[in-house]
């Protein structure tokens, strides 16, 4: 039965395409997990990843005389990158640090964000046009877009910069941010 499927040109192209999408999706997720320090989960995924990779590559190498298989392999690779990144966006692993500078001095904004469940550190900062409120907010990535919308609703002219912190240590941040539930 398998030999019949593999001898069908269209079926072979689809199998190679799907195998490479799966392989590269696993590869992308494994790399992201590795960068985020999830080494054991990354190692487990790499085991599945390599099995899929060897299967797909052997199908292509056994049929190198058929250019459509090579094209399917390359196309599957590109699509796998997109699929892997979409999966990672949905998983939203890790945390983000959001720095906000208000257009004007606004001591109420930090309070409003805290009431919504965000951990906020704030201070008065001097800008070219006068005093402003500067805020640092650490939140899980899954709340990133919600946080941006909240900030824009409370201060539509706020300056926002976000980045992923490499290391988080000390303070109430580590325990409190993990337990905190953001209110909508």
Swiss-Prot record:
Coiled coil: none annotated. One of its GO terms (cellular component) is plasma membrane. Its main location: membrane. Signal peptide: none annotated. InterPro entries: DUF2179 (IPR019264), DUF5698 (IPR044035), UPF0316 (IPR022930). It comes from the Bacteria. The chain crosses the membrane at residues 9-29, 41-61, 67-87. It is a multi-pass membrane protein. It is found in: Cell membrane. Pfam families: DUF2179, DUF5698. Keywords: Cell membrane, Membrane, Transmembrane, Transmembrane helix. PANTHER family: UPF0316 PROTEIN YEBE (PTHR40060:SF1). Belongs to the UPF0316 family. This is UPF0316 protein YebE. It comes from Bacillus subtilis (strain 168). The gene is yebE.
